[in-house]
Amino acid sequence: MELASGARYVSLPCLEAVMVRGRLTMNAAQRALFEAVGRSGKLIFSTGGDTISANLVGVFTVRRHGKEDRLDVDDGTHHVHVKWRRVARAEIGTSGGEGLLTFWNGNDLLFELFRPAGSFPAEVEALVGELMAPS
């Protein structure tokens, strides 16, 4: 959908991606976690529900793009715009032998990152938990 400002808005059940002017920046806890995630090798980003799902595969890096912190896949051709204020908590585990990071806003599942090579490194595990200071 195109907004009056000319920006594009995409809404999926579990993740809102908004490409507009404004600050979409990470806090220190989120930045530390995603920098460690970026050193974890090739990952699979997964979001969606019963109706629509999307997967992106590659090495994920947070890069500043204008006034936002964007989650880039490999060279950034494919990327994810994130409302970081909604990424409140991360949980770590495994699923089918793959490492699994699950990102939440309250009880709402936002997205998951799978690591086909196995469990995430201890560096990542040490940084999961609450990512937002209580309001």
Where is each model-derived feature located?
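Eukaryotic intrinsically disordered, low-complexity regulatory linkers and tails enriched in Ser/Thr/Pro
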Residues: 1-135
